[in-house]
Swiss-Prot record:
It comes from Escherichia coli (strain SMS-3-5 / SECEC). Involved in base excision repair of DNA damaged by oxidation or by mutagenic agents. Acts as a DNA glycosylase that recognizes and removes damaged bases. Has a preference for oxidized pyrimidines, such as thymine glycol, 5,6-dihydrouracil and 5,6-dihydrothymine. Has AP (apurinic/apyrimidinic) lyase activity and introduces nicks in the DNA strand. Cleaves the DNA backbone by beta-delta elimination to generate a single-strand break at the site of the removed base with both 3'- and 5'-phosphates. Its cofactor is Zn(2+). NCBIfam families: PRK10445.1 (NF007763). Its EC number is 3.2.2.-, 4.2.99.18. The lineage of its organism: Bacteria, Pseudomonadati, Pseudomonadota, Gammaproteobacteria, Enterobacterales. PROSITE patterns: FPG_CAT, ZF_FPG_1, ZF_FPG_2. It catalyses: 2'-deoxyribonucleotide-(2'-deoxyribose 5'-phosphate)-2'-deoxyribonucleotide-DNA = a 3'-end 2'-deoxyribonucleotide-(2,3-dehydro-2,3-deoxyribose 5'-phosphate)-DNA + a 5'-end 5'-phospho-2'-deoxyribonucleoside-DNA + H(+). This is Endonuclease 8. The gene is nei. One of its GO terms (molecular function) is class I DNA-(apurinic or apyrimidinic site) endonuclease activity. GO terms for biological process: base-excision repair. DNA binds at residues 70, 125, 169.
Amino acid sequence: MPEGPEIRRAADNLEAAIKGKPLTDVWFAFPQLKSYQSRLIGQHVTHVETRGKALLTHFSNDLTLYSHNQLYGVWRVVETGEEPQTTRVLRVKLQTADKTILLYSASDIEMLTPEQLTTHPFLQRVGPDVLDPKLTPEVAKERLLSPRFRNRQFAGLLLDQAFLAGLGNYLRVEILWQVGLTGNHKAKDLNAAQLDALAHALLDIPRLSYATRGQVDENKYHGALFRFKVFHRDGEPCERCGGIIEKTTLSSRPFYWCPGCQH
């Protein structure tokens, strides 16, 4: 499943294609959404927001399309009039004069009013988004030490969208490697330096992934280009200590770590 950085990049692509342009055609596969098609013609997308792995497409008439790709959903941007060759099932089409965005295969799709946005079950449940620039390491530390989360092992906590939205398995693995901790630790057992390091890594690693993953110009990022240090690298030497990276299972997901420098 894509994690927060991948969802945010998808949102950026959708915004770049149709933001601010009048919609010339709108189509929804689900019967309960059909009545919104005519209401959106002539409106435009004001912005595309991410809440962890959910995507909110906001329209100029104050309606918001909620979608969660889960395992199989995918957005595509095409030239208007182009029909991609795919076996996927089309769920949503938002068309402008020159670009069209298409959502395939997703099943979790709703249209929300401003009032419904504030009461939607998933949106109520998720924590702050790690890519939200307003989220600070201080707030991340407060959440780590809160009664709700301080006794949770990191193996499960860093996959829980109620803690911080947008984290997933590769980010969990890379964050814990960055701070030299294993997944069985709890926030209540860390010292001040460890807490500070973890609070920063919880935000820095996802933001670096969003900004630079897939880029090839290392000079632009002064060597800070995001790349996996342990994820999918079992059997290889750890670049920090030379130990051999191992793979196990934690919270029902593959977990990669270095026993030489993660304790």
